[in-house]
Amino acid sequence: MGEPFETPGTPDPNLHIYIDADACPVKPEVFRVAARHRLKVTLVAGAWMRVPSDPNIALVVVEQGFDAADDWIASHVERDDIVVTADIPLASRCLERGARAIGTTGRPFTEDNIGDAMATRTLLADLRGAGEQTRGPAPFDPRDRSRFLQALENAVQASLRGDRSR
């Protein structure tokens, strides 16, 4: 029944993965990669959810409120930590703190592309506000899951090496 989430050994105390957990479709993939590298994972959500019984995995339930989970993550993330989120403003805040951010479809957010992502988000919000109908995100598919796994593994390897290029 799948891979175990626990891996013997001590987690790397300098690297942490945070998940913007509400509606995140790739939590099991994060658990697998984190177990392989013995990394701590913190899921941040607005409501309780089931998480694996693993001493390296924690759930933080924040008060209901606009951006409460985002604010918690942004205030706790540190340089080279990894944040998994589909929220572009949260990704931007984390990049400002020196962390890495990966979208749930495997798109790494970087200093080079976050400005365009924010501008596109703002433009689409403005169009919707003006009554225009815009397409929502494409349905999540197995290729997204595969891209995400590769992007997360790349981010973990880069953080463990101390690679500052983003």
Ranges and model annotations:
Residues 2-166:
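Nuclease catalytic cores that cleave nucleic-acid phosphodiester bonds
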